[in-house]
Amino acid sequence: MKLAIIGGDGIGPEVVAQAVKILDVVLPGVQKTTYDLGARRYHTTGELLPESVLAELREHDAILLGAVGDPSVPSGVLERGLLLRLRFELDHHINLRPARLYPGVNSLLAGKPDIDFVVVREGTEGPYTGTGGAIRVGTPNEVATEVSVNTAFGVRRVVQDAFERARQRRKHLTLVHKNNVLTYAGTLWCRIVQEVGEKYPDVEVVYQHIDAATIYLVTEPSRFDVIVTDNLFGDIITDLAAAVCGGIALAASGNIDATRTNPSMFEPVHGSAPDIAGQGIADPTAAIMSLALLLAHLGEDEPAARLDQAVASYLATRGNGRFSTGEVGERIAAAL
């Protein structure tokens, strides 16, 4: 296995370092290459993602990313020039976000809710393509448009992946959209889900409007198994899902090219948190959980399962203790 490692900004290098230590325990011998991409490189060279580096990244089996973003760089520069460019250049059309409430983790929801689902979010279309514009800017008659692009090809490949995941889980798929208002895109999504669903008679399919889905994520999260949705709605509900599962410090994600033509990229959902960078207090759990997703994606099912069990064991026994970044890594390694 050839793994590219991008620590990035803020606490990114710190949490990724712990994930790499865990990797060496659970799967020794992985070939690792570290890339200096982020604010430091941008300030030094003016580069965000050189073509030569992008070409090298393509030669790896997967990418492990820490975090991107720094207050010394104008907002959006690193995010668009590095993070989003990686996703689009490497065709990461699936954003995978598991949502699970582990034993020992407190939820904002009352009681002990049963939460274990996964969101399959389309990652390269919708309103995130940069299609749109503005006229008469700065005048009382300014007009701004943001176009949501949805293609049959793009929707179908994401829906196909979601059905496959549902078949391997509890065989229940929920399409989340807003087809009563977004009629063109909504009709496309509904039709393709229906067409693909004919090949999966064992998977139950239901539809929910995005506003209803946000209610049920809070009031009855156990009804969800696999959620498939577009880029914007997925962006919103995945953060809500993280909030009810213990917060983004425990949220892992995968940006996946399901064709495996390009390396997929795995990262914790949390940001770079520059205010605590270098203090040794950042929680690396989400980065380590992202490593488990990476291993599973590459077919390393046994190490991935062991790592998931080790994380669960750590979370179940940590209590209210506050541990340093290194201590968390050590405890999960010990659980392995």
Swiss-Prot record:
Transmembrane segments: none
Ligand binding (substrate): 87, 97, 121, 211
CC terms in the record's Gene Ontology section: cytoplasm
NCBIfam families: PRK03437.1 (NF002898)
EC number: 1.1.1.85
GN (gene name): leuB
Pathway linked to the protein: Amino-acid biosynthesis; L-leucine biosynthesis; L-leucine from 3-methyl-2-oxobutanoate: step 3/4
Residues with site note (Important for catalysis): 128, 178
Tagged with keyword ATP-binding: no
Cross-referenced SMART domains: Iso_dh
Similarity section: Belongs to the isocitrate and isopropylmalate dehydrogenases family. LeuB type 2 subfamily.
Subunit relationships: Homodimer.
Reactions that this protein is recorded to catalyse: (2R,3S)-3-isopropylmalate + NAD(+) = 4-methyl-2-oxopentanoate + CO2 + NADH
Function summary: Catalyzes the oxidation of 3-carboxy-2-hydroxy-4-methylpentanoate (3-isopropylmalate) to 3-carboxy-4-methyl-2-oxopentanoate. The product decarboxylates to 4-methyl-2 oxopentanoate.
A molecular function GO annotation: 3-isopropylmalate dehydrogenase activity
Cellular compartments annotated: Cytoplasm
InterPro entries associated with the record: ICDH/IPMDH, IsoCit/isopropylmalate_DH_CS, IsoPropMal-DH-like_dom, LeuB_actb
Species name: Mycobacterium leprae (strain TN)
UniProt cofactor(s): Mg(2+); Mn(2+)
Enzymatic class: oxidoreductase
Main location: cytoplasm
Organism classification: Bacteria, Bacillati, Actinomycetota, Actinomycetes, Mycobacteriales
UniProt entry keywords in alphabetical sequence: Amino-acid biosynthesis, Branched-chain amino acid biosynthesis, Cytoplasm, Leucine biosynthesis, Magnesium, Manganese, Metal-binding, NAD, Oxidoreductase
Gene Ontology terms: biological process: L-leucine biosynthetic process
Highest taxon of the lineage: Bacteria
Binding-site residues, NAD(+): 271-283
Cofactor annotation comment: Binds 1 Mg(2+) or Mn(2+) ion per subunit.
Protein name: 3-isopropylmalate dehydrogenase
Residues annotated to bind Mg(2+): 211, 235, 239
